[in-house]
Amino acid sequence: MTLPQAIRDKIFLMEEVINFPTSLLFHKNYHWENLAMVHYSNLSGAVESLMERGRKVAIATGFYVPAGNPPATETDGPPGALILTEGLKYLGMEVSLLSDEYTLSTLKAGLKILNLSERDVPLIIFPLEHSDVDHSSRTVNEEVESPLSIRFVQEFMNGPLGRDLSHLIFIERVGPNHTLESFLAQEVPGNSSLKDFEIILPPLLRNRCFSSRLEDITRFTAKTHFLLEFGKKWNPSFESIGMGDRGNEIGSGKIPWRVFKDHGTSNREPVFCCRLKTDYFISCGISNWGGYALMAGVALAKGRLDVLEKITPEQEGMVLNHLIHHGPSIDGITLKQDYSVDGIEFNDYMRVIERLKEIAFE
């Protein structure tokens, strides 16, 4: 099914808003890090996919910051996952939330403030792989070294929550950076950037999960990317959507490594950029905005704008505040329990969300 042009135009405008939001904001000195990714963003494709095939959806999120005060998951990711969870469920889809133990309390707090039980929305906890304590475990055959993760993927895909899964959505979920194999799979034959890759990413830095500060958080990160790499062995029909704002999130593998090397805003992007690609990728200045845009697009396409009526500054502020204090969650930039997301104070953060809603209702 192809969306009517009028709806496609609105979705294009939403995508523009979440990638180039500066004109909407009171403070103009924010620094956006997603510009290299915008060309690869496909919000309309993600909307069409959910519109046509959305039945049973699993949403993965959680970006843990061990250097935070306190150490906690970011405020970017869970709010976007929760708005999608609530909205898609309202539209009649089965929805589950998936993360690891470091984000569990935040997601539980989110469901509680939304008056949703774990019977309404199952919480799936992907186990941490003990081998990741050994730094060298990622430089050998990772599948062999990760029996716990492989078994979990198999059991999930064959179980009641994964069987007949139509969509797997990743929102601000950190994923591993490149390996030599993933780099070569992206490269055009004869390209001379192999030497650059080997200099920038020596073997012991490959297949690791990094924050944008180049903090190695591999041992704090369950291998949720295995759902993409190996999940189709047991469920070949699901489609995947990824959302990110820096390039170290699952889904960003849609963007070639050399793009991050040549057009990144710092020399850190080619180190931390994730190799995992999804069927559809949504670039955004803040990943939560991608979740709101996807929800607004699906509501618009289905003619169900009533789904968006609950989205107000008061409601979203209440949810964010609850996550901060009861998750807990922290701002990934300030590293504190601030009433902000990625360094963007709440009023400015909310202006983008309100604009998405305005576009849908225009």
Where are these regions (language model features)?
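A short helix->loop->beta-strand "cap" motif at the edges of active sites that frequently abuts
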Residues: 93, 232-240
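Short internal beta-strands
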Residues: 93-102, 243
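An acidic, phosphate/nucleotide-engaging active-site surface
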Residues: 109-231
